Amino acid sequence: GMLPMVALVGVGNGIITPFLYFPALRLFKSMHYMAESDTVDSDHSGLSLRQSEEGVISVEHLTYTYPFAKEPALKDVSLAVRKGDFVIVTGPNGAGKTTLLMSMAGAIPHYYGGTMEGMVFTDGKAVTQHNIADLASSIGVILSDYKAQIVTLTVGEEMAFTLENHGFPPEEIRRRSKEALAKVHLEGLENRKVTTLSGGQCQRLVVAAVLAEEPDVLVFDEPTSALDPEGIREFYEMVGELNEKEGLTVIVAEHHLEAALPYAKKFVLMNHGEIIVSGTPEEVMRRMYTEHIYEEAIPDMYKAQLELEQVGMTFEKPFLNLADAETSVIHSFAKGGEKDA
């Protein structure tokens, strides 16, 4: 099954700062959290692997099983993410969302072990042919337990930490840090102690530290689970801005769909390790409703539209926000709510 949280924390630090990982790896193995065997090592170094789908990330017929697990966590999963996409991956707990995201960053198979069939390409790089440090220049990962990714005392030190380890000179570190902090609205806080930041600010700091490495893709694993409704709204405003203004490709594993709706271009619904459907938010939520898959995650407003349609009403616009819902209802009643002929 999944690794215990202590292991995930270590793996998370490994993704952002790979050299931290290796002492943790020995610890996990000695405590039997990670497998010594039941792992297929494929040396693809001599092969020329090319992705078959267009896209900044191409997941191709990926089947993956954690060490010693009886069932695959992912079963023949294929997904193409294009540059500039804003993708929400949703589904019940245990659907495979986190596993899919970790495969994009190369944490699967490099750090989790296990067996993998199929391939994942990130920025054209086959994840089995590149280590996580190579992939980190293309893809930035923010874990659900984002505080575990903070390893220093002040905001400025946190921003400099990974960049220093990449060997960037001080003036380049200052430039990148300043620009990244401004993008997440934390400018001027370099001297602040990390312990004085709110939960939302800590999360923004982790995002800024990842942005300073200038990746093309940002991956968030359930980023809003510890935030209040206002924090969730602010988070999506920030990430929506990074997608729109900076052109970053964004992939989020998420349960709270309502706040994501104004920004998401694509939804992906997972269940039991498979992708059930991917498409526009509206297409995917309709399938969730008609097939009774993770219905509880459908925003109340959109569910109200689907239920009104069941009794014969038609609407000009989907209820993706309150303004559209009000307009559509008023127009529908003005027409008498008749079904189109």
Regions found by a protein language model. Give the residues of each.
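Membrane-embedded alpha-helical hairpins and interfacial helices in multi-pass inner-membrane proteins
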Residues: 1-38
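The feature captures the beta-strand-to-loop junction immediately N-terminal to the Walker
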Residues: 90-92
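Conserved ABC ATPase "signature" region
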Residues: 171-189
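Conserved ABC ATPase signature
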Residues: 193-197, 201
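Catalytic Walker B motif of ABC-type/P-loop ATPase nucleotide-binding domains
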Residues: 218-221
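H-loop/switch region of ABC-family ATPase nucleotide-binding domains
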Residues: 254-255
